[in-house]
């Protein structure tokens, strides 16, 4: 198994690429230093910051007993093992920290990066335990089941016949803006599971995958249970803990944060705007747009509704139109914190206040919007944890490795390496495709054949005076032979050109297939393709293989893996 590391700054995806914030965050130099100074609290490259964070978390008070109880209850419901219960128990100690990551539940686990996030949290926690053996570090996967973007969660994709096959079950008894975690599946889900399984190629692992998904995504189950049971099964041998924030006990722990937001809004939004202005002055584009109130109201139908600040002390729920004074909504929050849900601005604050978070494993987009939140962390009286880029892979199947071999033979210069071919593919695929149009056909074909015909005519003409002296009747025979010889050369030229065009077409077709494999529909493979495509073909041991690769490499570079 070959691996190659690519600098994120050298990757240009056909569609959505990586933000400038993320590219600078994972690079070296002045831009990174400036970004960290202005937008983050800790630097993972500074040894002193690790001791600072350990001391800081050790001095804070957390509701550890409550956390342990609710995590045990949740994870037992998801089918955890004794390994996971022992891991949860560690959190009772003030010398136990959390390495957190998370994602909204995706259909059948969702795209590959969900698996990569979980593995990155596990590996980083193990690495910290090796560095600080007197502490424990527990990897926690925060399931963002309060998200209400059904279209994003209820979709997944597989490679099929050189194309991308999409799967989207129809919503079952779902209301607009309803939280996805509690959305249940109807009988239609049986068909979606069957179509998904049928699309997977036959393999020794297909039957087990079918059994897992049919059980986890049975009619009547929910996105939360389906996702959690699937995750727990795949990571049954890994110390990964799952967390659902849609839990009454967890909401009680969140109550003070919700109350501070309601009591001080729109201060948090002004903080994000001020931090965003700093980023824009540094030349970056920001993506997180705060609201005056960074909370949603959850009604009795589990719909997430906007809370609008109409006047200084008047709040209104949309679209239901209930109105509350600031005092009334604070009382409501005190009595019923389960009716509130943080948006993207407030969610990290909730996470890093309730959990003793040593580090957060984040994707490129998350790192970009976390850069906007430093002032908000300070507003809520906490320090940002280490922000660690998640592991990022492109998995290369053998047939595409062979295409890379062919490209290396045809386009490579002396000393050209496989890594340089991948660099060319990931850095400027369109230019590579344009260049390939002329690769197979020799650029000097026309000149060489013209020179050959001219030389042949000259040689044949030089025979004429010699033949005339020997026998004048040979002159017409020579003329006919000259015509025939030129026709043979022209025929050879046409066949050469035809062979070149065919070779071009084959090469371009192979490059096109590689583009679909590496950038399906123009986006990175890890953002589109479901994990089970590769688990089905290469077995569940692939998870351990990728974990080992992450253990040996920095997550600040993209990893190409030839399977």
From Swiss-Prot:
It comes from the Bacteria. Keywords: Coiled coil, Ligase. One of its GO terms (molecular function) is ligase activity. It is an enzyme of class 6 (ligase). Residues 444-464, 493-517 form a coiled coil. Its EC number is 6.-.-.-. Belongs to the BshC family. NCBIfam families: thiol_BshC. This is Putative cysteine ligase BshC. It comes from Chlorobium phaeobacteroides (strain DSM 266 / SMG 266 / 2430).
């Amino acid at each position: 198994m070959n691996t190659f590391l690519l600098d994120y700054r050298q990757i240009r995806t056909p569609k959505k690429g990586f933000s400038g914030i993320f590219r600078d965050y994972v690079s070296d130099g002045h831009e990174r230093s400036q970004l960290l100074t202005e937008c983050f609290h800790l630097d993972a490259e500074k040894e002193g910051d690790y001791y600072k964070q350990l001391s800081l978390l050790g001095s804070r008070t957390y509701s550890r007993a409550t956390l342990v109880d609710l995590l045990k209850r949740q994870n037992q419901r998801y089918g955890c093992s004794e390994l996971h219960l022992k891991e949860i128990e560690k959190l009772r100690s003030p010398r136990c920290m959390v390495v957190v990551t998370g994602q909204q539940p995706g259909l059948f686990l969702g795209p590959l990066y969900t698996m990569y996030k979980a593995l990155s949290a596990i590996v980083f926690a193990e690495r910290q335990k090796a560095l600080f053996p007197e502490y424990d570090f527990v990897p926690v996967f925060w399931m963002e089941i309060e998200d209400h973007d059904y279209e994003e969660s209820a979709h997944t994709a597989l490679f099929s016949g050189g194309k991308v096959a999409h799967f989207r079950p129809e919503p079952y008894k779902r209301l607009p803006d309803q939280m996805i975690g509690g959305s249940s599946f109807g009988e239609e889900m049986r068909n979606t599971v069957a179509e998904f399984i049928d699309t997977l190629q036959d393999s020794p692992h297909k039957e087990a995958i079918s059994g897992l998904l049919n059980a986890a995504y049975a009619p009547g189950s929910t996105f939360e249970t389906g996702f959690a049971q699937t995750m727990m099964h795949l990571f049954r041998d890994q110390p990964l803990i799952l967390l659902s924030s849609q839990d009454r006990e967890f909401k009680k722990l969140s109550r003070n944060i919700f109350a501070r937001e309601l009591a001080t809004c729109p201060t948090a939004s002004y903080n994000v705007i001020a931090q965003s202005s700093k980023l824009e002055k540094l030349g970056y584009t920001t993506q997180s747009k705060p609201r005056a109130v960074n909370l949603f109201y959850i009604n009795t139908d589990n719909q997430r509704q906007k809370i609008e600040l109409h006047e200084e002390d008047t709040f209104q729920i949309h679209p239901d139109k209930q109105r509350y004074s600031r005092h009334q909504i604070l009382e409501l929050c005190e009595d019923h914190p389960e009716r509130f849900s943080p948006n993207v601005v407030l969610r990290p604050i909730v996470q890093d206040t309730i959990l003793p978070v040593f580090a957060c494993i984040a994707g490129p987009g998350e790192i970009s919007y976390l850069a906007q939140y430093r002032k908000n962390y300070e507003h809520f009286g906490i320090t940002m944890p280490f922000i660690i880029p998640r592991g990022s892979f492109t998995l290369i199947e053998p047939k595409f490795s062979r295409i890379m071999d062919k490209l290396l033979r045809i386009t490579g210069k002396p000393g050209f390496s496989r890594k340089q071919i991948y660099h060319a593919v990931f850095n400027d695929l369109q230019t590579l495709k344009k260049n390939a149009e002329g690769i197979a056909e020799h650029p000097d074909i026309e000149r060489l054949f013209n020179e050959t015909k001219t030389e042949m005519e000259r040689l044949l003409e030089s025979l004429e005076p010699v033949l005339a002296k020997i026998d004048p009747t040979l002159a017409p025979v020579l003329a006919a032979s000259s015509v025939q010889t030129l026709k043979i050369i022209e025929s050879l030229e046409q066949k050469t050109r035809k062979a070149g065009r065919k070779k071009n077409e084959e090469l371009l077709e192979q490059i096109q297939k590689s583009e679909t494999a590496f950038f399906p529909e123009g986006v990175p493979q890890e953002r589109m393709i479901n994990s089970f495509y590769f688990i089905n073909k290469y077995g569940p041991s692939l998870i351990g293989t990728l974990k080992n690769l992450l253990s040996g490499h920095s997550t600040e570079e993209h990893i190409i893996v030839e399977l």
